[in-house]
């Protein structure tokens, strides 16, 4: 498989090149299964937030969940929130917003 080398958060990684369209390929930035990369990216993002008074950590569902979890762990946040497309059966009282 072809890869694209990247230097991210002080680490070198080779990301797989994935076809998006007939004319477009990308180096897919994948953190799943890479604990070291997740920890380092969380450190770097928290550095960007230094001096900012925020109330919550909030992310979109799926691929960013390990990252937000690590950011919460490193920052001492007791909770973080995940935006999902719809409620899940295990959510007793989700916050919901209608959109078009």
Label each region the model flagged.
Residues 1-54:
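Active-site-facing substrate-recognition patch
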Residues 8-9, 60, 82:
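Glycine-enriched loop-and-adjacent helix/strand subsegments that border the catalytic/binding cleft
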Residues 54-61:
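Short glycine-rich phosphate-binding loop at a beta-alpha junction
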Residues 57, 69-70, 81:
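Short, hydrophobic/aromatic-rich beta-strand segments within well-structured domains
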Residues 63-66, 87-89:
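Short, catalytically relevant binding-site loops at active-site mouths
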Residues 66-76:
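Short Gly/Thr/Asp-enriched flexible loops that form oxyanion-binding sites at enzyme active sites
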Residues 78-100:
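Short, glycine/charge-rich flexible loops or terminal/linker lids adjacent to PRPP-binding catalytic cores
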């Amino acid at each position: 498989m072809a890869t694209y080398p990247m230097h991210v958060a002080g680490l070198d990684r080779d990301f797989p090149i994935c076809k998006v369209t007939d004319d477009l390929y990308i180096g897919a930035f994948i953190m799943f299964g890479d604990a070291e990369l997740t920890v380092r990216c969380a450190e770097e993002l928290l550095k960007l937030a230094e001096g900012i008074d925020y109330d919550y950590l909030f992310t979109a569902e799926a691929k960013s969940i390990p990252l937000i979890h690590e950011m919460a762990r490193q920052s001492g946040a007791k909770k973080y929130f995940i935006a999902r497309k719809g409620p899940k059966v295990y959510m007793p009282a989700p916050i919901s917003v209608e959109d078009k």
